[in-house]
Structure formats: structure tokens, C-alpha cells
């Protein structure tokens, strides 16, 4: 039976209603998605403003000793948070501000008598007698700058001949050529290159600016000359020290690593804009002499980390960030950086909800704050690593267990940053408790991040390395300079000692040990005074 026109119209209307409902549903989903994107962008803007204009510290001052809460305001306990015993922090005494004399006590002092009175001024106004000195006092102190200077030294070689044999068929001669030049064919001395290296790697002063400074001293030393000599000296004299430090590092059981991108212009078969990497590999908090090494590689492949640690005994502890490439390092106990976890959670707290302890981001962050508070208290009390091991198991393990329980049930909802934080933490869940196994294990990767900072600061000034050889030389100088800093040495003096002593691959480890920054003689010669 044919449908009537009314039936056809009714069917068409139903189809139209169905289409409209689908359109409404699609539009509602689009609106919800755009609203979520809008909220995420607002949160991103708030985070960027905080990064640009707010405090960079992740710590929050407690209102009174022992308070583990993060934010000021009414005290509310976060939902389902366990509360282990609180460790009270000792009250810090404010350090007394040093006097002017104390600030500059290590500077050489010269006393200059004041003599501005004429002979007439020194006649007594009552009786007319000539006055005599009866006492002195210091009326002011000034710091005077003496501009550095460069000198040209000409070494004169004397030739000696035998007076008895001079008229024979075999006259005898000998010439005193002295010590070989620091760098063959170059006028650059040990002291000059020490200054150039100190200014570039200690003060982050680029070579083009040093070139201008030398011109003011009537010395046209080009940046290309400086760069060439820096590379040559690094290869000849710093590489043996670096290899010695590396051998020492492979005997250690607690290590830390980090990496950062750099630009190297003239790498084979690679565009100049391609990222290369500097790595820092350093010893951890084991109470032994710190060793800090830098390494250059064209890529970020985890194989580079594995290759650098080749030869180390299995079972060592490695603290690193979340980069998966570190998984290439086999037979190691991986530790997770709790500072990274705390940072992710802090950045996921929505603006205006800092006091809302029902917010999952705040809850997760409070767990981290409690752990950091315990760690600070252990350092304040001066606990040794055995005591730290015991206290961590008693204080911190229950907190981490509560954190893991929170992690299993937490719902990030529409908070994109919290989703990212949760994913980051879950990918590292198996490493969260590794540091509890030994009191010498680091709780965070802050030490290696602090060690990689000179690279990032220098990168802003140097901008790039021209060649792989230059990049490798940079890592050698950074190693020497940062090692000197770790032992409180005068950077220029230590560089100068190494260049004057000229370490070589022919030296034994016992000989190289005498040039290490932890050597007592080196400490005395390179003290900051």
C-alpha cells in the first residue's frame, strides 16, 4: 500500500529531528572539548606567568617548625592521607652579616698615610709651637683596581762550543733550548691560556668579547687563535686528567646523570640545526670525593650512556630523570627523582585551588612535601648514611605506600597537566622506592641538574660549538672547572697548575693523582686567597 503524503512528511520530519539531535550532540561535544581546551590554555597561561614573574622555588615556607602543610590558611587534612610521625625542623639562626674588613680580609692590604695639612696648619693656635704626631687611625677603606697587563717574554737560547775543538774537523756544539713550548708554534703561554679558559668556562665570557678586551691591552689575539689553542691544550693536557677521573668514577657505586641539547655546526652528515648533546655524569652523595664529568655526543641515544659507563661493576645505583634512554644502562639499580615528581604535581595544581586539600593534585603534592621535609630534617640533624637509611624506612616508606595507594585510585578528571603528571609517575613507579635501599642513595637528581646548569648558562653566551673537536674540548674544560669549584679551588690557579705540569698519557695514576683537585698540595696551591 502506498504511503500517503502525510506519512512521507512525518517520516521526513522524524529524519530531520534525528539529524538535528545528532548535530546538537556533535555541537555539545565540540563545545565541551573547546571549553576543556580553553581551561587548559588558561591553566597554561597561569603557569607561564608564574614561571616568568613568580617565585621559582618549589618549596613553601612552613608557618612554624614541624608544620608539613604546603599552603597557608585554615588547616584541613587531605583526604585519606596517612600521617606518619612529624620530624621537627630545628630553628635556623640568622647568619651574622660580615663586616667590611671580614669581607675583604683575603685581599693584600696597603696603608697610605694621609698628608694634606700644610706646615702652617700644624702650628698650635694658642702657643705657636710646631705640633708633632701623637697617634694614627684608619679613617676609611677603599678597594683599588689595578688593571692587568700582558708582557712579551723572549726566551734566549745560548749555544756552547768547545774552545779546544773549534778548529778541528769535529767542532762540538750544544744549544740550551730550554723546556719545549707549551703549544708548538704558538705564542700562547700557560698563564695566558689559563686566563682565556677561566674567562670562558668560569665566567662564561665568549671568545669574541675576550678578543675585544685583549685589544684594549694592545694585544690583537683573535678568537680563532684562542679557539685553536684551547682545543690543542685540551687534547694534549686535559684529556689525560679526564681519563684519570673517568677511571676513578667507574669504581664508585652511586652515580647521577643528566643531559642537555647543544648545537654543533660542522658535524659530518648532519645539518647545523640538528641537536647534539652534552651529558653530565657525576658521583652521588656517598660522602667520598666528588667527581663530575661532562661528555659530548652527536645524539641522545641511550647507548651513549651505556657506553660511557662500560666497565663499571654491576649493581650500582643510578639517579637520572625520566628519559627512557637510561634504560640502556644494564645491571643498575635505577633511582627516581622525586624533585621531578613534585614539580609535575605542583604545575598541575589549578590556579586558585592551592588551599583545596580535596584536589587530587594538591594531595599528591603534599605527599612529596612530606618526603622533602623529612629529607631536609635529616640533613639539618647531620645524620650519617646508616642513620638516614633507618629513618627513611621508618618515616618515608609509609608515606610512599600512601602515595602509591593514592596513585592507584586518583582520577585526574579534566586536568590535562595532572594527567601528564600521573602518566609520568606511573611510568616510573617501579623506581620510586629504590632510594630506600641505601642511605647513600640520592632522593633527587638536583645535584646533576645543578652540574648541567653551567652548560645551559654557557650555551646562552657561546651559542654553539663550531666543530666536534671544539665541543669535546668544551666538555674537558667544563670537567676541570666544575671539579675545581667542587673543591673550592681558585679556577685560574688550578688551570694554570695543570698547564704548567702538562699531564700526559704516559703518566701513571699515582702521578696524575698528585694533580687531582682533592690532593692536599693542590688545595694549598690553589686556595682562594
Question: What residue spans do the PLM features occupy?
Answer:
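Short, flexible loop/hinge motifs at secondary-structure junctions
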Residues: 1-184, 227, 256-257, 320
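Catalytic center-proximal scaffold of phosphoryl-transfer enzymes
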Residues: 2-6, 121, 159-161, 166-529
